[in-house]
Amino acid sequence: MAQSNQHVSIYNPKVIVYSIGLTTAILASMSIYRSHFVRFSTSLDVPKTLFRTKHLHGKVTSVGDGDNFHFYHLPGGIFAGWGWIRETPEINKFRKLKNKTIHVRLCGVDAPERSHFGKPSQPYSEEALQWLRQFILGKKVKVKPLSVDQYNRIVGRVFIFRWNGWNDVSEEMLRNGVAIVYENKSSAEFDGMKERYLKVENKAKKKKKGLWGIERGLTPGEYKRLYK
């Protein structure tokens, strides 16, 4: 019996449909990989297309001030093997993690300034630092990047998962009186939360929580302008 030697043209509708389907699947896979499995080492590595639309998941590796921290990006979470196949980094390993972490500035809040370059520290600055360390250091958080500031830090809205769900870290700082609502109107990032933050801050004031329970001095914004 003679074998068929029919040639299937690349213009055959079935071939075209198959090619389109395969190409679409490949492009979708690449997009998912870039969005969920590519690790970003520093703030400058994060694509602008992810700002305000996506969350970066990872681990807080150090907290050096009352309103910012370093964060090791763990894309894909446990599905990418982090914590069981791939090791997550230890905390406070500064040399080992140099150029491997994203510096994050919490949006919408300002904590009392610590002593830097011979400048005096503000009252309650150490308490604010210790509160933030206790709350997030060594823990998994998610960061919604909003912008990059003059120090190449990602200004972001940060969430930590607790017994009652995802908690906004900036809001929790205001609730506990360890930070105030950010005052610089021209460069402030709030992700639409300013009015809520002001309400939470006002409640903390009335209850004299944290820094509201001590004698008032300069606000963090006033302090920075004074020692600029």
From Swiss-Prot:
Enzyme class of the recorded protein, top EC level: hydrolase
UniProt entry tagged with the keyword Transmembrane helix: yes
An MF annotation (GO) of this entry: metal ion binding
SUPFAM superfamilies documented for this protein: Staphylococcal nuclease
Active-site residue list: R105, E113, R153
One Gene Ontology CC term in the entry: membrane
Superkingdom of the organism of origin: Eukaryota
Transmembrane portions of the chain: 15-37
Keywords: Calcium, Endonuclease, Hydrolase, Membrane, Metal-binding, Mitochondrion, Nuclease, Transmembrane, Transmembrane helix
Location(s) in or outside the cell: Mitochondrion; Membrane
Disulfide cross-links: none
EC number: 3.1.-.-
Membrane topology of the entry: Single-pass membrane protein
Binding-site residues, Ca(2+): D110
Domain TNase-like: 54-214
Homology family: Belongs to the LCL3 family.
Protein name in the entry: Probable endonuclease LCL3
High-level lineage: Eukaryota, Fungi, Dikarya, Ascomycota, Saccharomycotina
